[in-house]
Amino acid sequence: KFKVNGNEKYSGTIQIGLKENDKNTFADVILANNKVNEKSLTGIGESAILDEGLLKKEDDHGVAYYFRGNVKNNNVLFADKNWKIVKINGDGSIKLVLDGVIDELSKYYEEDYAFSNSTIYKNLEKWYTNTLDSYGDYIAYYKYCNDYVLDDDNYLAYNRVITNKIPTYVCLGNLVNSRIGLLTVDEVSLAGGSTSENKKFYLYNEKITGAYYTMSGAMT
């Protein structure tokens, strides 16, 4: 949880699922049009400012494929909104992040660190109902990772990603069933983010002028 004062704008993520008997899935199209690179050009924890393409890493469901750096070919138009492809999940569904902002943000939490009880989740659910509900057949009911497990004097996610620089797609926190959520700090790091400002990776959004919100915990 990254706390800021006042209201900000933020972006949400959804998972595009599979329909039975589909022979050419969205994941198939992505893999057919992108070479899977063996390793990243920059170290994990460093800002990725070049197009590092598609890489692979294990997640909770199997082998996942993710984009990293200043990628240009991960754009998708869905539900009349522009999205960025974050990764192909191990189960074949696709994680998208909105390439824009959702207005009307309240603070991430009141007195609770749990995402499912947060004000931001209620706002995301409201936005989903008003904007994406009619596309529900294509959006997966997914287990999002809400990693707010304490580890000594900080949160496990902070120590793992910021201090030790070993981000993972395997959830070490609590899984939240939802059709919409936020990225984790692990996902931001693997996409090319770091503790330094990076304006040259695909998650950078000039419309977000305040703090980024994730589903991972951190002391402020």
Q: Residues of each region from the PLM?
A:
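Long, domain-scale functional regions
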Residues: D22-T220
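C-terminal, structured domain-capping segment
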Residues: K1-K23
